[in-house]
Structure formats: C-alpha cells, structure tokens
Amino acid sequence: MFDILMYLFENYVHSEVELLVDEDELTKELTRAGFHQSEILKALTWLERLAELQESDKPYLCNHDQHSFRIYTKEEMEKLDVECRGFLLFLEQVKVLNVETREMVIDRVMELDEPALILEDLKWVILMVLFNAPGHESAYEQMEDLIFEQPEEGRLHS
C-alpha cells in the first residue's frame, strides 16, 4: 500500500499533474502500473481518510496545553521507533508540525499496513499530510526542504 501512495504522490501530486478524479480510471492506471487491486483499494481508502481528517471535528485536540508532551501508545511505539518519534518532536519544536498535524500524521501512520516505519517513510507520510492540510503551505515547503536537501555533516536531522 505504501508503494502505491508513493507512486501517486510522486507521479500526480508532487509533479503537479492533475490527479484523475475518477476512481475507476485511477484504479485502472495503477493496475497497469503493476499494483494489485486489493492494495490499490487500501491506498485509496487511506487517502480518503486523510481527506476526512481535514473535515472532521477533533475534540481530542481542543483542550491541549501548549507545553504538553505526547505520550505514545504501545502500538504507536511499535510502529514508530525512537528515531521516528524524535523526528516528530523535532518537527514540532521547529514549528513544521503542530498538535493537529502531528496527530494526523500518527493517525495515517497507524493505518499503514507496515509493521514498523523507517524514518524516510515517515518523512513522506508527513509530506502527504501537510500537502493535504489547508493553511500549512509553509510547513509543507519546510518539510520538502528537509526531504530533498543534501544532509550536511554533523546535522542532527535531515
């Protein structure tokens, strides 16, 4: 499923090619690209749920203290190792993510059918979430820079 998400993001979204609106046509295109029907359905559902997160009420985000600290569940810690969780914290500290977008990222990560995510894959999920979050264009651009720039010697995160 993650491969399909990456394919869609790289070939349609990130390249600024207009994404096919018709789900059947998109499914045919992905099938021609070599993806399996069941994985295509999972990826499209993942994207639909991402869009729904933008529109839904989020009562769990309403009453948070500005200085609160995110405690991860056991399942989240299994999927996001220390490096990934540290990177999420780093992105909050540099204002690329806020509480809302961080929770959207965690929600989307937990829906992936991968047992654990490596940092590079997490970066792409973050980019997808920020791309789909209205009003977060600057954060998207910062995240894009973090993904595509060449790491400098001695840098903590890239």
From Swiss-Prot:
<comment type="similarity">
    <text>Belongs to the Smg family.</text>
</comment>
<protein>
    <recommendedName>
        <fullName>Protein Smg homolog</fullName>
    </recommendedName>
</protein>
<dbReference type="InterPro" id="IPR007456">
    <property type="entry name" value="Smg"/>
</dbReference>
<dbReference type="Pfam" id="PF04361">
    <property type="entry name" value="DUF494"/>
</dbReference>
